[in-house]
């Protein structure tokens, strides 16, 4: 590295006290689980995995992942039941709160001593050929990083994760579509250090392949970036990365290398001033429409794909009606409210719409058209009329469209919420009552460059 990152690392790297607290709790939990398994005669072993096990977690963001692995001969129902029982038992012994979740199969999350701890049952495998479920790879991932990442490179991983986080490109969940932690670690292995990753990213193009172990399977994937999993030749670690986030990371890398400011390791400053946001909108000369509804009782991994599907359908219908959309996005507090926002280039249309009929030369069709319509003229060779629009404003059109949601391609649970109730408003009419988080989202929506340059 050519830049001094010591001051940045002081803010993002766990200090001695934090490291000790996290590791002591992790070790105690693993010991508790293994003790419970022995007491109950369960053939299973707990092991610490993830960023805590690899020493690559950002300060204040230690999510402890403990996998409970069972022999391959264990029936799946028994694995689920015994794994959950051990997780619940451990959480109870530590006086924590439990929440059951679901990935490829159920697991339990505990909130213990201020930390979020996942207890995940899986199968004990030695290589990917023995894979029974997607989570089984995680132990192999942890082992690979532990064996290949040099101690000094852990600082580079922290810098890369924080840079990605501050530029909005970190996180493989659907809502973000960015870089997973394991992917960031592999990039450091490939390029050597933090700056090496940024310089290497400038060479990326859609379909770019990174294959650390030379598996030779990269051409079989069609994702924007292909990083062949070192422990599973048939998996692309970057499969969740969208082209948008990939391009944003390349842009942020280019900006940083040209001006390596420490501000790139801090989140952008987004406005929470409603007047400032409406002022920005006024200068742009556009209008923002806000569609709001409730939050369905589904996990966030199910919520956001449904929002994306619904919003895409809304935009398609608006465009087909003649209302031009500059940009669209969605946001939810995941408890009470869900919002879809659309910045409109054209939000109001003339009272009449020009419609074209058959060519003048079409004897049968022209006569029927002329009988049906008055005030017909010719443009080119087509009979033409003016027809009154049903909806001149995009707001009016959307209220009508959403009141008959069968006309939209919507996510199932979002559709239920819209049928229960929704509102369609101009941003100017509702921004005064908006919460801080929504205002920050709106500023980011109107100023997407803020995440990528400082």
From Swiss-Prot:
Question: Quick one: which residues bind Mg(2+)?
Answer: 63, 65, 118
Q: Which GO terms describe its biological process?
A: RNA repair; tRNA 3'-terminal CCA addition
Pfam families, per the entry: CAA_C, NTP_transf_2, tRNA_NucTransf2
Which controlled-vocabulary keywords does the entry list? Answer: ATP-binding, Magnesium, Metal-binding, Nucleotide-binding, Nucleotidyltransferase, RNA repair, RNA-binding, Transferase, tRNA processing
Enzyme class label: transferase
Misc remark: A single active site specifically recognizes both ATP and CTP and is responsible for their addition.
Question: This chain belongs to which protein, by name?
Answer: CCA-adding enzyme
Organism, as annotated: Methanothermobacter thermautotrophicus (strain ATCC 29096 / DSM 1053 / JCM 10044 / NBRC 100330 / Delta H) (Methanobacterium thermoautotrophicum)
């Amino acid at each position: 590295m050519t830049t001094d990152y010591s001051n940045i690392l002081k803010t993002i790297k766990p200090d001695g006290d934090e490291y000790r607290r996290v590791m002591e709790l992790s070790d105690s939990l693993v010991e508790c689980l293994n003790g419970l398994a022995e007491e109950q005669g369960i053939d299973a072993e707990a092991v610490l995995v993830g960023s805590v096990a690899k020493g690559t977690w950002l300060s204040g963001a230690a999510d402890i992942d403990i996998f409970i692995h069972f022999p391959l001969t264990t029936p799946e129902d028994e694995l689920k039941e015994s794994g959950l029982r051990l997780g619940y038992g451990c959480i109870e012994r530590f006086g924590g709160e439990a929440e059951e979740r679901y990935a490829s199969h159920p697991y339990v999350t505990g909130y213990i001593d201020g930390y979020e701890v996942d207890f995940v049952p899986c199968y004990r495998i030695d290589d990917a050929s023995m894979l029974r479920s997607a989570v089984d790879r995680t132990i192999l991932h942890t082992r690979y990083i532990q064996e290949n990442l040099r101690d000094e490179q852990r600082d580079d991983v922290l810098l890369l994760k924080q840079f990605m986080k501050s530029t909005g490109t970190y996180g493989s969940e659907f809502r973000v579509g960015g870089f997973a932690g394991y992917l960031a670690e592999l990039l450091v292995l490939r390029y050597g250090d933090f700056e090496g990753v940024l310089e290497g990213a400038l060479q990326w193009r859609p379909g770019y392949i990174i294959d650390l172990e030379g598996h030779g399977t990269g051409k079989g994937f069609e994702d924007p970036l292909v990083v062949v999993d070192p422990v599973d030749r048939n998996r692309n670690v970057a499969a969740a990365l969208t082209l948008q986030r990939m391009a944003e990371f390349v842009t942020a890398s280019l900006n940083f290398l040209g001006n390596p400011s420490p501000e790139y390791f801090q989140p952008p400053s987004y406005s929470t001033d409603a007047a400032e946001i409406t002022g920005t909108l006024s200068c742009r000369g556009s209008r923002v429409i806000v569609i709001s509804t409730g939050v369905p009782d589904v996990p966030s991994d199910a919520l956001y794909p449904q929002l994306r599907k619904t919003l895409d359908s809304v935009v398609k219908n608006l465009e087909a009606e003649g209302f031009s959309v500059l940009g669209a996005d969605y946001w939810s507090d995941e408890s009470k409210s869900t919002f879809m926002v659309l910045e409109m280039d054209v939000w109001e249309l003339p009272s009449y719409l020009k419609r074209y009929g058959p060519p003048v030369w079409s004897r049968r069709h022209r006569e029927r058209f002329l009988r049906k319509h008055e005030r017909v003229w010719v443009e080119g060779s087509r009979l033409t009329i003016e027809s009154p629009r049903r909806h001149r404003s995009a707001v009016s059109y959307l209220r009508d469209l959403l009141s008959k949601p069968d006309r939209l391609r919507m996510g199932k649970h979002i559709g239920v919420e819209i049928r229960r109730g929704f509102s369609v408003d101009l941003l100017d009419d509702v921004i005064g009552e908006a919460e801080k988080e929504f205002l920050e989202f709106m500023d980011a929506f109107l100023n997407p460059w803020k995440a990528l340059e400082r």
